[in-house]
C-alpha cells in the first residue's frame, strides 16, 4: 500500500524517472547551473545532495557507491575532484533553487534555476 508515501512521479516509470534524475544531475555537474521546472529542481536536489556527501568522503567505496547511482565516470570525477572540495566546511544545502519570474511558454510550468552554492 502507498498510504502517505509522497514522491513526484512526473508521469514516468521508475526507470524513466531515474534516467531524468541522472540526466539533470549530469547537466548540473558539468554546467554548474541549469534552468528547469521548479518540481524537477526540487527532485534533483534530493538526488544530488547525497552524491555530494559521498564525494566529500572521498573514499574508493564512496566513489563506487556514487557510480552506482550516477554511472558516468567523467561526471563522478568532476564531482569528487572539483565540486566536493568547495563544500568541506558545509553540512548540507549544496544547491540553491531560484524561482524565475516567468513561466514556460508551452505549458505555463513554473521555472527555476538550480545552481551550486558557492
UniProtKB/Swiss-Prot annotation:
Disulfide bonds: none annotated. It comes from the Bacteria. The keyword Ribonucleoprotein applies. SUPFAM superfamilies: Prokaryotic ribosomal protein L17 (SSF64263). It holds the Pfam family Ribosomal_L17. One of its GO terms (molecular function) is structural constituent of ribosome. InterPro entries: Ribosomal_bL17 (IPR000456), Ribosomal_bL17_CS (IPR047859), Ribosomal_bL17_sf (IPR036373). One of its GO terms (cellular component) is cytosolic large ribosomal subunit. Keywords: Ribonucleoprotein, Ribosomal protein. GO terms for biological process: translation. Belongs to the bacterial ribosomal protein bL17 family. Part of the 50S ribosomal subunit. Contacts protein L32. This is Large ribosomal subunit protein bL17. The gene is rplQ.
Amino acid at each position: 500500500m502507498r498510504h502517505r508515501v509522497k514522491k513526484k512521479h512526473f508521469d514516468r516509470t521508475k526507470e524513466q524517472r531515474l534516467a531524468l534524475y541522472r540526466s539533470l544531475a549530469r547537466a548540473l555537474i558539468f554546467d554548474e547551473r541549469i534552468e528547469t521546472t521548479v518540481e524537477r529542481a526540487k527532485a534533483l536536489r534530493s538526488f544530488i545532495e547525497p552524491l555530494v556527501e559521498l564525494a566529500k568522503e572521498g573514499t574508493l567505496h564512496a566513489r563506487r557507491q556514487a557510480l552506482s547511482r550516477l554511472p558516468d565516470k567523467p561526471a563522478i570525477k568532476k564531482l569528487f575532484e572539483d565540486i566536493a572540495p568547495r563544500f568541506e566546511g558545509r553540512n548540507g544545502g549544496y544547491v540553491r533553487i531560484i524561482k524565475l519570474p516567468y513561466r514556460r511558454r508551452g505549458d505555463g510550468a513554473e521555472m527555476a534555476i538550480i545552481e551550486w552554492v558557492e
